Regions:
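Low-complexity, glycine/proline/serine-rich flexible segments
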Residues: 9-68, 117-119, 123-128, 188-190, ...
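Extracellular glycan-interaction surfaces
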Residues: 26-49, 73-82, 105-181, 546, ...
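Extracellular glycan-recognition modules
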Residues: 51-119, 156-158, 218-223, 492-493, ...
Length: 1012
C-alpha cells in the first residue's frame, strides 16, 4: 500500500518541521477510495489572438444527451479575466454550447463573463439569461484551481440544481436556476466548445485547462475527482464514485449518554429524511444528554456535511463536535446543511460526531450526515457505476498530433482550432499540470508541476494598457513609450534555475527591453525608471548590466560584449545557493570576462546576489512589441546547463511544508462557560494573541508559555499597561490549543473571537549567549522565538534568540509598568523603530526620545544567535531597566513560510495597486506605513473574512491591533498563492508614494499552489 501526499513523492516531502508530527494528518492510501497515483501529464494553453479568434476545442454531436443533468470537472490556471466584460477584453469563457453562432439562440456560458466572478448561465429562450454567479472573486493567476460544476435542474431543492465546487469546497452562488431548465449542453446536434463562447464566437479563453471531463446524465459529487491529501491541499484522483454506504446499519453505533428524546431515536438520523422533526436528539429532560455517532470503522472523507441545527440559546461551545473538535460555531441555528469540510482540526477520517441536548430550548440535533456526497442511510448500498452517458468525454491533451482525442470509451473526439503543437514558444501543449511529479533520471522534460508564468496581479500599469501578460501569461505586450515591468508568480528561493527570454525588437528611442530578476521589494510603479535607480534589480538591457545599484545608479552600459539581435533567445542561469547568475544568447554564454560556465560555477556575470526573494521579470516599452518568456513548461530553445532546472514549483524545497504546523489563525464564539477548548491547532502554542472582533470595547490579549497562566500573564497589544493576572481567561496551554476560563475578554457569551498562535518548539530553554539569561521557546524550523528576560540596566544588552538566522522582525514589551510596545523591522530606517499600543501606536517610524528612549538596535548588526537592545542617557524603560521583566518575540524570515518586507503605495491605476510577493499563500498579515503618520497598524487574516474559505477574495475585514476597535470594513486586499494584492486607496495600507512594512505568515508555500 502506497501512502500519497503528492504523486511520486514520499508522504512527507516538503513537510519537514511538522510540529504535531506526521501522525497529526490523515493520508489517504492508494487503495482507499480509488485515489491512486493519478497523473495529469499535460495541459493545453488557450490564447486569444483577437476579439473573435483564438484557441478552442469544438464538438458537434448528432446524438441526444441530457440537458438537465450533467457534470463538468476541469483544472484551470491563469487567465486574464480580471477585467472581463470590458470592451478591451470581453469575457473569458471556459465551456459553452449553443444552437449556433447567432446571438439569440439557445446557449450557455460557464466561465467569467463579468470580471472575476465565476458564472454558470443558461439562456434557453435565446433572449433571457439565468445567471448563477459566485460570491467569490477568482484573482489568483499563479495557482491551479479545480472546478466541478454539477447540474441537475430537475432537483426540487433550488440550490441543488447548480452546484459548484472549487478545490474541493462547495462555494456560495448568488442565485438559482429555474427547475427543469434545459441547458444547451447535452442538446442534440448543438455546438459545444471548450475555450470560447459558442453563442457569439467571442470571449476566447486566456488560461490553461487540464483534465477536462464531461459526464452526460450524471450529477456527481466533487469526491469523484479529488481528495484532501493534506490540510488545505486538494489533490486529483482517478475518477471514481466513492462508496460510503455498504449495507451498514449506522444507527447501531449511535448512542445517547442519558437516552434519546421521545420520538427522536438514533434511526431518525440515518433514514435519509430531511426536515420537520425527523431528527436524532438527546433526552433534554434528563439533562445533558449527548448523542454520539461513532462509525464501526473510521470513514475517510473528502467532503463532510451535516443536515441539522441547534437552538440559538445553546451557548455551550462544546455542544457540537466532529472528531472531538468543537464545531458549534459552524453548526448554526436553524435547520439546513452545515459544511464542515476542511475546518481547522477537522481532518479525515471521520471518527465521531456528537450533539448535546441540555434542557428545553438548548438542544442540538441532526437529520442526516453526508460523506462525499452520500447521505448515510441504514442498510443502503451505494452504486459506484461511473458513466459518461451518450455525449460525455474526457480530454487529457496527451497526443500532440490529436489533442482533441476523447479518452473515454465514447470516442467523442473534439476538433482543435487555433492550436499550435510545433516545438517552440508557440507550442500550446504544456507540462504545466496540477499533478506534480519529479523528473526521471535527471531528464527535466519529465517533470510536471506548476510552472512560473507572468503575474497579471503584479504589473506596472492597468490591465487594459501595455505591460499586460498574454499568451498563457508567458508574454508581455507593450504599446507605450514608458517602461512596463511585470514579475513572474514564483519566487526563486534556493536552488539552480534556468529560463529564456526572446528579444522582441531593436532598442532605440522608441523601443526597448530588459530581462532578469527583480526582488520582491522592487518598486513596480509607472514612475520607476531602472536606468536611474536599479535597486532590487539584477538584469540586462542589450549590453548593459543592472546590479542592484552596484557600480552606478542604473545600467552599466557596455558590460556585455554581445548585443542580442531581434528574435534571439536570451538565456539566464541563476544559482541562488551560490548567489551567482550568468547570461548569454542563442546557446552561447556571454564572454565579457573569462570563460563563463554555469555548470562549473565559473566566471559569473553577477555575484553576491540574494539566495531568496528574487523573481523572473520582463521590462518592455515600445510599439506593439511582444516580449516572450520560456519557463520550460513547453520546452526551451537551448539545453540548460547541467544541474539547472526549469521554472517549476516542483523544484522548490520549502523548509516548512504546511504553515498550520507552526502558525494558525482560529476563530471561535464565546460561551461564558469555563472549560471551553480552542482545540483546532496542530501544535501546542508558545505565543497567543486573542481579540473579540465583534466588539469595540474589548482589548487585545497576549499570552505566552514563558509567563504561563497565573500571575501577570496577560499583556495588551493596544495599550501600554503592565501585565495583568488573567487566570480566568486562559487556564491552560494544551497539545492542540488552550482552554478558556469565564473572563469575557476571551470568552464572552456574545463574543466572536479571533486567535493567532505561534509554535515555539517542544520545550523551554535557557539561553546564556548574551549579557543576560533568556528563557525562550524557539522553533528554529519556522524562525519563531518567544523570549523572556530581566533587564540589567546597561546602555546596551545582547540577548540570545536561538533562531539560527538573523531576525527580521522583533517585538518587545516590559511586563511591568506602563511602557511602550517597541517593534523593529528589518526595513526600518537606521536607528528607528515603531510603537504599537497606546497614543504612539499610529506614529511613523521614529528615533526614541525622552521617556520613550530605549530601542531594539538595527537588525543588520544582529547575529544568528543574538540581538541587541540599547538606549541613551540611562533611560531604558522600554527595553532594559535593571530588574524589569520583558517579553520579546523575535522572528527570522523563512522562505515559503514567513516574509518581512516593504512595499510602495500607489493609486494611479486601480488594477495596478501594489502586489506584494511572499512566496506563499498568506494566512496572517500585519502592516504599517513607515514614513507617514498618524496611521493605524492593520491586520488581515484568511479566517474571519469569511471563515477560512479557500481562494476567497476580496477580503475587506480589517483589524487594528493598536486599538480596541471591532473589526472594520476597509483596506481591502486579496490573498493569493504567491502573496497579497492591495485593493484599496486607504492611507493605512496604500497611500500614494508612501512606504509600508509588513510581516506575513503562510498557510501553504507556493510549492503547493495546486488545489490550495
Amino acid at each position: 500500500m502506497t501512502n500519497l501526499w503528492y504523486p511520486k513523492q514520499s508522504p512527507l516531502v516538503g513537510l519537514t518541521g511538522l510540529a504535531g508530527g506526521a501522525s497529526s494528518y490523515f493520508v489517504r492510501s492508494a487503495t482507499t477510495g480509488a485515489g491512486g497515483d493519478y497523473k495529469i501529464p499535460y495541459s493545453l494553453r488557450f490564447k486569444r489572438t483577437s476579439g473573435s479568434a483564438g484557441t478552442s476545442m469544438l464538438q458537434q454531436l448528432n446524438v441526444a444527451g441530457d440537458p438537465k443533468k450533467f457534470t463538468l470537472s476541469f483544472w484551470y490556471k491563469g487567465g486574464n479575466h480580471q477585467n472581463a466584460g470590458t470592451p478591451a477584453f470581453g469575457g473569458t469563457c471556459i465551456v459553452s454550447a449553443a444552437a449556433g453562432n447567432a446571438g439569440s439562440v439557445h446557449r450557455d456560458y460557464i466561465g467569467f463573463p463579468e470580471t472575476d466572478i465565476f458564472t454558470v448561465s443558461a439562456n434557453p429562450s435565446g433572449s433571457s439569461w439565468q445567471h448563477n454567479e459566485s460570491t467569490r472573486k477568482f484573482r489568483d493567476y499563479g495557482a491551479w484551481y479545480h472546478f466541478v460544476v454539477k447540474v441537475d435542474t430537475a432537483n426540487s431543492t433550488a440550490n441543488e440544481r447548480t452546484v459548484v465546487w472549487v478545490n474541493g469546497e462547495r462555494i456560495d452562488m448568488s442565485a438559482n436556476i429555474s427547475q427543469n431548465t434545459e441547458f444547451a449542453i447535452g442538446k442534440q446536434n448543438y455546438y459545444m466548445n471548450w475555450g470560447r463562447y459558442t453563442g457569439e464566437n467571442k470571449d476566447y479563453l486566456m488560461a490553461y485547462l487540464a483534465d477536462c471531463q464531461y459526464y452526460d446524465g450524471s450529477a456527481l459529487d466533487v469526491s469523484t475527482f479529488g481528495y484532501w491529501s493534506a490540510p488545505h491541499q486538494w489533490t486529483a484522483r482517478k475518477p471514481a464514485i466513492q462508496k460510503v454506504n455498504a449495507g451498514i446499519t449506522w444507527s447501531n453505533t449511535c448512542t445517547a449518554s442519558n437516552g434519546f428524546n421521545s420520538g427522536s431515536p438514533a434511526t431518525k438520523g440515518f433514514d435519509g429524511n430531511l426536515g420537520g422533526t425527523d431528527h436524532v436528539l438527546g433526552d433534554y429532560g434528563a439533562g445533558n444528554s449527548r448523542v454520539t455517532f461513532t462509525p464501526p470503522t473510521p470513514i475517510p472523507f473528502s467532503t463532510i456535511r451535516v443536515y441539522g441545527g441547534r437552538d440559538s440559546a445553546l451557548k455551550d461551545k462544546n455542544a457540537c463536535q466532529i472528531n472531538g473538535v468543537n464545531v458549534s460555531d459552524y453548526w448554526s441555528n436553524g435547520d439546513g446543511w452545515k459544511n464542515f469540510t476542511n475546518l481547522p482540526g477537522v481532518t479525515s477520517p471521520l471518527t465521531s460526531i456528537s450533539a448535546l441536548a441540555k434542557t428545553t430550548g438548548q438542544v442540538a440535533y441532526w437529520m442526516a450526515i453526508e460523506i462525499d456526497g452520500k447521505i448515510l442511510v441504514d442498510g443502503a448500498t451505494d452504486s459506484t457505476t461511473l458513466s459518461f452517458g451518450n455525449k460525455g468525454s474526457h480530454l487529457k491533451f496527451e497526443d500532440a498530433s490529436a489533442l482533441g482525442t476523447d479518452s473515454s470509451s465514447n470516442s467523442n473526439n473534439w476538433t482543435p482550432n487555433g492550436v499550435t503543437t510545433t516545438d517552440g514558444w508557440d507550442n500550446d501543449q504544456f507540462r504545466d499540470t496540477p499533478t506534480p511529479y519529479e523528473e526521471i533520471e535527471d531528464d527535466i522534460t519529465t517533470v510536471r508541476g506548476n510552472f512560473c508564468t507572468l503575474n497579471n496581479n503584479d504589473r506596472t500599469n492597468a490591465i487594459t494598457s501595455s505591460g499586460t501578460a498574454s499568451n498563457g501569461d508567458t508574454g508581455i505586450v507593450a504599446s507605450s513609450g514608458t517602461w512596463r515591468f511585470i514579475r513572474g508568480n514564483m519566487t526563486l528561493d534556493g536552488g539552480k534555475w534556468y529560463w529564456e527570454y526572446q528579444v522582441p525588437g531593436s532598442t532605440d528611442g522608441s523601443n526597448g527591453w530588459q530581462m532578469g530578476l527583480l526582488s520582491k521589494e522592487f518598486r513596480n510603479t509607472s514612475d520607476q525608471d531602472v536606468n536611474s535607480d536599479a535597486q532590487y534589480y539584477w538584469g540586462r538591457q542589450v549590453t548593459g548590466r543592472y546590479n542592484n545599484n552596484v557600480g552606478g545608479s542604473g545600467a552599466q552600459n557596455g558590460h556585455f560584449d554581445t548585443s542580442p539581435a531581434t528574435g534571439a533567445w536570451v538565456m539566464f542561469a541563476y544559482d541562488a545557493d551560490a548567489g551567482k547568475m550568468w547570461t548569454g544568447a542563442n546557446g552561447v554564454w556571454d564572454t565579457c570576462s573569462g570563460s563563463p560556465n554555469p555548470a562549473t560555477g565559473t566566471d559569473p556575470h553577477w555575484t553576491g546576489m540574494p539566495s531568496s526573494g528574487l523573481i523572473p521579470s520582463i521590462g518592455i516599452y515600445g510599439s506593439s512589441l511582444l516580449g516572450k518568456m520560456r519557463n520550460g513548461g513547453n520546452g526551451f530553445a537551448y539545453t540548460p546547463p547541467t544541474g539547472f532546472k526549469p521554472l517549476c514549483n516542483n523544484y522548490l524545497a520549502p523548509t516548512v511544508g504546511i504553515g498550520a504546523s507552526h502558525f494558525e489563525a482560529v476563530s471561535y464564539a464565546g460561551d461564558g462557560i469555563s472549560g471551553q477548548k480552542v482545540n483546532q491547532y496542530r501544535f501546542s502554542p508558545a505565543l497567543v494573541w486573542t481579540k473579540r472582533y465583534n466588539s469595540g470595547a474589548a482589548w487585545w490579549n497576549v499570552f505566552d508559555r514563558n509567563r504561563g497562566v497565573s500571575t501577570d500573564n496577560c499583556l495588551f497589544l493596544n495599550a501600554t499597561n503592565a501585565a495583568s493576572s488573567r487566570n480566568t481567561q486562559l487556564t491552560s496551554f494544551n497539545d492542540d490549543g488552550w482552554t478558556l476560563g469565564t473572563n469575557g475578554d476571551s470568552n464572552h457569551s456574545d463574543g466572536n473571537f479571533i486567535s493567532y498562535a505561534w509554535y515555539g518548539g517542544s520545550s523551554q530553554v535557557t539561553d546564556t549567549v548574551g549579557d543576560v539569561n533568556v528563557s525562550r521557546w524557539t522553533d528554529t524550523t519556522a524562525g519563531i522565538s518567544v523570549m523572556y528576560y530581566t533587564g540589567n540596566g546597561n546602555q546596551s544588552c545582547w540577548l540570545g534568540h536561538g533562531l539560527g538566522k538573523v531576525p527580521a522582525f522583533v517585538i518587545v514589551k516590559a511586563n511591568g509598568g506602563s511602557y511602550e510596545w517597541i517593534i523593529k523591522h528589518q526595513f526600518n530606517s537606521s536607528d528607528k523603530i515603531f510603537y504599537l499600543g497606546g497614543s504612539s501606536g499610529t506614529d511613523a517610524e521614529s528615533t526614541p526620545t525622552g521617556g520613550n528612549q530605549g530601542k531594539i538596535a538595527n537588525l543588520d548588526g544582529a547575529t544568528t544567535t543574538k540581538l541587541k537592545v540599547e538606549g541613551e542617557g540611562g533611560n531604558l524603560h522600554n527595553v532594559n531597566v535593571n530588574g524589569q521583566a520583558y517579553v520579546m518575540y523575535a522572528f527570522a524570515e523563512i522562505p515559503g513560510f514567513s516574509s518581512f518586507g516593504q512595499y510602495y503605495g500607489r493609486t494611479d491605476f486601480s488594477n495596478a495597486f501594489p502586489f506584494i510577493p511572499c512566496g506563499f499563500t498568506p494566512r496572517f498579515i500585519i502592516g504599517k506605513t513607515r514614513n507617514v503618520g498618524p496611521r493605524d497598524w492593520y491586520i488581515h487574516d484568511s479566517q474571519r473574512d469569511p471563515r477560512d474559505p479557500i481562494g476567497y477574495n476580496e477580503r475587506t475585514k480589517c483589524m487594528l491591533p493598536n486599538k480596541s476597535d471591532a473589526e472594520v470594513t476597509q483596506q481591502a486586499i486579496d490573498m493569493v498563492s504567491n502573496g497579497f494584492k492591495i485593493r484599496n486607496t486607504s492611507g493605512g495600507s496604500n497611500g500614494n508614494t508612501n512606504y509600508y512594512v509588513y510581516a506575513a505568515w503562510a498557510r501553504n508555500p507556493f510549492k503547493h499552489a495546486i488545489g490550495e
